């Protein structure tokens, strides 16, 4: 890793007499330094301060190359007056359209600069270069200069530290340097360590020329690029890196959002976006750059309709992806959004099994023939979207994909589902039962059984006064209706058996539908079943929070639910413990509002952020107390 200084050389004194041409000496002072450094060249001041390994000097044929040579040759005791005069003459003879000086003429200057570098820093590697550019008075010369600056990329290596001096020469030079540095950073992985400007204009006022590091300006351009990459492509890797020192919390959140966008993890993305907005409102006037970035973040968030329905959120993600040419993610969102919308229209949470049931309904031959809405939706999915989606998802190289028009496809899906006229869910069940009686089809039987399970879950949710959302759907289907759940209630036991039974007969299915329909809500209430389901649900959630898998540790987690002392060490555990006591002590009594409310509270708490629980109540402490409890019982 080398330190490389790139510095322009100005014209200085325009006198054609080499003996009279002068580069004015000035006292240069760095921020924080008490003493300044006198020199005709800010280049030498930077060399002394930075201890660089090599220098690249850029100037026109009219720049004061002979004075540069004179200064460094005398510093290292190798001044050649004949060479000095020759260079001076060639500089004097050069015109903007006729250069008498070539880079070959400057080789001796390169050598004395390298020796000077060794004098200042014995470890300097050397390899300095002197480069001649055009004036840049027309487009052709501008492109010639651009080519020269781009060739400097070959003078640096991966990992080198770059220092720029922009004090002298044409005002176009810093612009070329900026573009060159951008290329260097991407193709050579170099690091910008400083952009220095010797402020000669304020010498009269201050008595010295401050050497100012302007690299924060380059940092601002990094912020702008990072902001653009995130709001346009969802790529937060640059902006989050820049934000780490300014606001680590937002930096980490943007990293998560970026990962979820890349992976198309819409549930996790939605949750992160939902919590980002209030966080931004808290910090709207903070940070050097964050305060300018926050309004753009709000615009980005507003494009993702995270507060609307699942379908609206998916459609907004499809549109955002299409707008930003991320067609693969866009089509994955758009294709699956159809089944999310159908779940919404039938008042079902958009869990995977429900979406599969919706797919089964629109693909059922008798239903999509009888109801034009289902036929239209099936055609949209099967004929227009499915092949594109599968081609993307499976990276198929064996055949060409279908042509696609994202904007039209998006508009047509939205319009189709906005105005769709669907049959009642009970009517679908009636039609399918009739169809399966006349033609006992295994696919239709399986679809009906899955619909029956939906009706059972709906029935339980209504009976227990739960919300019909994904959280309660998961709790009811996975825990309350678990085939091993303990029950005092015979009706609930029968419902659980039906839920898990593989029914392959149309008549038996019809009986099951009627049984579920005719069962009163009150007949399904069971305090013991609810307590047992809550216990296993809590065990699952807390085991995940503690990342445990072995049986003994899980038993300890189950035990801690009733341990008031340990649970009191964290507010979430304390509240879970208080509510669980209410359920546990009443598990053999008739269902009450107190038990139901306590259960809802626990489910809510278990779906909050549990990441800090293990810090307040470490697993090893739980295990020690649990083992002590077991030993005392023997």
Curated annotation (Swiss-Prot):
CDD domains: Csx1_III-U. GO terms for biological process: defense response to virus. CRISPR (clustered regularly interspaced short palindromic repeat) is an adaptive immune system that provides protection against mobile genetic elements (viruses, transposable elements and conjugative plasmids). CRISPR clusters contain spacers, sequences complementary to antecedent mobile elements, and target invading nucleic acids. CRISPR clusters are transcribed and processed into CRISPR RNA (crRNA). This is CRISPR-associated protein MJ1674. Keywords: Antiviral defense. Encoded in a type III-A CRISPR locus. It comes from the Archaea. The keyword Ribosomal protein does not apply.
């Amino acid at each position: 890793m080398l330190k490389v200084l790139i510095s322009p050389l100005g014209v200085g004194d325009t006198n054609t007499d080499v003996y009279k041409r002068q580069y004015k000496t000035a006292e240069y002072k760095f921020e924080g330094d008490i003493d300044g450094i006198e020199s005709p060249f800010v280049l030498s001041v930077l060399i002394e301060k930075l201890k660089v390994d090599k220098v690249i000097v850029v100037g026109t044929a009219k720049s004061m190359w002979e004075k540069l040579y004179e200064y460094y040759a005398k510093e290292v005791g190798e001044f050649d007056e004949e060479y000095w005069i020759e260079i001076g003459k060639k500089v004097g003879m050069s015109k903007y359209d006729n250069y008498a000086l070539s880079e070959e003429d400057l080789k001796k200057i390169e050598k004395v600069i390298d020796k000077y570098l060794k004098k200042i820093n014995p470890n300097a590697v050397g390899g300095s270069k002197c480069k001649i550019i055009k004036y840049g008075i027309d487009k052709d010369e501008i492109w010639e200069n651009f080519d020269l600056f781009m060739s400097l990329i070959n003078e640096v290596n991966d990992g080198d530290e770059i220092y720029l001096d922009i004090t002298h020469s044409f005002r176009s030079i810093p612009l070329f340097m900026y573009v060159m540095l951008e290329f260097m950073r991407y193709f050579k992985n170099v690091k910008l360590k400083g952009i220095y400007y010797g402020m000669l204009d304020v010498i009269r006022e201050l008595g010295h020329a401050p050497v100012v590091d302007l690299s924060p300006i380059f940092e601002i351009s990094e912020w702008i690029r990072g902001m653009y990459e995130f709001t346009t492509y969802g790529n937060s890797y640059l902006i989050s890196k820049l934000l780490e020192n300014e606001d680590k919390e937002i930096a980490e959140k943007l990293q998560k959002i970026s990962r979820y966008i890349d992976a198309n993890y819409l549930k996790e993305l939605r949750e992160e976006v939902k919590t980002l907005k209030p966080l931004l409102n808290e910090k709207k006037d903070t940070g050097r750059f964050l305060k300018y970035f926050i309004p753009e973040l709000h615009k980005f968030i507003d494009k993702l309709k995270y507060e609307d329905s699942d379908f609206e959120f998916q459609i907004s993600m499809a549109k955002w992806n299409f707008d930003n040419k991320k067609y693969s993610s866009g089509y994955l969102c758009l294709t699956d959004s159809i089944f999310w919308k159908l779940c919404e229209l039938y008042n079902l949470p958009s869990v995977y099994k429900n979406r599969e049931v919706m797919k089964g309904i629109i693909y059922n031959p008798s239903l999509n023939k009888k109801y034009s809405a289902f036929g239209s939706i099936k055609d949209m999915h099967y004929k227009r979207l499915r092949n594109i989606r599968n081609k993307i998802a499976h990276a198929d190289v064996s055949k060409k994909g279908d042509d696609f028009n994202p904007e039209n496809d998006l508009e047509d899906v939205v319009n189709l589902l906005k105005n769709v006229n669907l049959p009642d869910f009970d009517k679908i069940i009636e039609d399918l039962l009739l169809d399966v009686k006349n033609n006992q089809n295994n696919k239709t039987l399986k679809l009906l059984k899955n619909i029956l399970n939906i009706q059972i879950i709906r029935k339980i949710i209504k009976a227990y006064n739960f919300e019909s959302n994904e959280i309660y759907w998961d709790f009811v289907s996975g825990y309350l209706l678990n085939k091993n759940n303990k029950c005092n209630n015979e009706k609930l036991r029968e419902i659980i058996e039906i839920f898990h039974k593989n029914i392959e007969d149309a008549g038996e299915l019809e009986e099951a539908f009627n049984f579920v329909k005719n069962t009163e809500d009150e007949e399904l209430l069971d305090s013991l079943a609810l307590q047992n389901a809550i216990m296993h649900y809590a065990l699952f959630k807390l085991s995940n929070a503690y990342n445990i898998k072995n049986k003994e540790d899980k038993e300890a987690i189950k035990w801690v639910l009733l341990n008031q002392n340990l649970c009191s060490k964290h507010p979430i555990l304390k509240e879970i413990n208080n509510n669980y006591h209410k359920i546990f002590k009443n598990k053999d009594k008739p269902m009450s509002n107190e038990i139901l409310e306590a259960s809802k509270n626990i489910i809510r708490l278990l779906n909050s952020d549990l990441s800090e629980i293990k810090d307040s109540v470490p697993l090893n402490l739980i295990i020690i107390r649990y083992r002590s409890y077991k030993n005392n019982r023997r």
